[in-house]
Amino acid sequence: MSGVDRSSQDEPVPFGSLFFHVRRGWGAPVWVRGLLLAMVAGCTTVGPDFKSPTLTRGVSVLPDSPAQGTVAGADDQHFVAGQTGSQDWWKTYRCAELDRLVQIALDQNPTVEAARATLVQAGENATAIQDNLTLPTVDAQLAQTRQRFSTAAFGLPGGQAYLFNLTNASVNVSYPLDVFGGNRRQVEALQAQHEMQAHLWQAARETLIANVVTTVVREASLRAQLDATNALLQAQGELLDLTRQRQGMGALSLNEVAEPQAELAQSRANREALALQLDQIRHQLAAYLGQYPAQNPLPEFHLEDLHLPQFLPQAVPSALLRQRPDIRASEAQWHQATANLGVTIAGAYPNLTLTGSMGAMALSPGALFSPASSVWSFGAGVVQPIFHGGALSAAKRAAEAAVQSAAAQYRNTVVQAFRSVADVLRALTHDAATLEAERSIMEARQQSLGLADQQYQLGGISYPALLAARVQDAQARMGIAQAQGTRLADTAAFYLALGGEVDPAAVAQATSGSPSSSSGQSAPSEAR
């Protein structure tokens, strides 16, 4: 055995894996120290920097969409330039019971609760990995072992054996030097994933709100249609009774009785279908509230309880990109794929890790605190991938394909978002025209019914003729109930298509498990 400290000699160092340990001084070769200092001083971040996409100048939702003005028809709706979607847009219906149910749904709906839990999970995972990659790892170790040692292990003659106890207490420190930014890119990808989950949670909230509103609107419309159907059944029933009386007196044939009888049967079938839809709507509303169908009594809604929102925000293309949570989530997914490409690229560069430990080693626990028992070490390791059988190149190509896929998915999300806004804008225009036409029909039927009633009182027409006017009036009321419900529901669809407004307080509360901003990492949506 030589008494020379081998760590102080310049020995050949493998290029692929370099390790050195220091005792009582920095004994590394000069060129190694220079290389490490240059690598640390020249820290960079490899891979492409993500930049939030923007729309091409001149892009509009519809070629002839009104920038501001009025959707023609009864109960005009105005598109107001410069107005954005309200955080509480459902309150524009001015229905206190609807507001209460929306709040219950946001608090108790399992889907929204699951989305929030997934968001918190993503935030906590990002925080854990971020701290592990950017901060030193410190561990305490205490070991008590009993060993049998032979001098033959060192080539000494005789092979004398020793049996002893060994106590070891130490503190170990490890710190990865992120020279080429692989760790920073990994943290960036995790933050982008957390941002994506935040937007998915927001999308779940907005979808739930729209579903509650449209369900309430459908209930109110169905109740109005049921009321009109009941009035229709009453008039058709009386008309059938009179027809049968006249047939019994020989004034009418059996064929003339069959027609009103079939109409009455059809109306009864329609009433049962409407009643079934109403029951199913009530069950669906309870499910949105996170309740069982018969758990709690729900309020009844009528069209008179709901008011049509008159002032709607203008659909601005640039605002769509920032307001719709599905677009923001797709952008964050694109950002994550870009950051993962940087992680893959950094994997082909050298990886430097600093390690150190300090402690004591003695033959008995009582001797741990003696000066002679102290031990320490400091080391650094550099690993440079050289040949991995083409795995690194394949991984890079796969990461580049993932970026292209995420970019294409983002473009598709934007296109579909613009399509949905265009659809609902057209729907609002046609809904207003349809409602105006149904009201014209209603006014004409009511005028006809009033004249028929006057003529009947004067003996100018028969009672069957009066009943026929009542039947037409009931049918007109059914049409206007459907038109009112459709317009109210499409208005909710319009707010959903705009994406609503993100509530900063709600997002801050839900993202309580997000990565700490003190780490020095910039926001996921910012350009790197």
What kind of feature is each model-predicted range?
Residues G248-Q277, G479, T486:
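Repeat-solenoid scaffold signature
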Residues F19-R23, A28-C43:
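Sec-dependent N-terminal signal peptides of Gram-negative exported proteins
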Residues Q295, L368-P371, Q482:
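Short proline/glycine-enriched turn/loop segments at secondary-structure junctions
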Residues Q108-N109, M249, L458:
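Charged, alpha-helical scaffolding/interaction elements associated with membrane systems
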Residues S2-G3, D10, G34-D107, G155, ...:
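Terminal intrinsically disordered/low-complexity segments used for targeting and assembly
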Residues A115-I129, A204, L208-A231, A235-Q245, ...:
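Amphipathic alpha-helical coiled-coil segments
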Residues P48-P53, Q87-D88, R94-I104, Q108, ...:
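Small/polar-residue-enriched beta-strand and adjacent coil segments characteristic
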Residues M1-G27:
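N-terminal secretory signal peptides that target proteins for export/translocation
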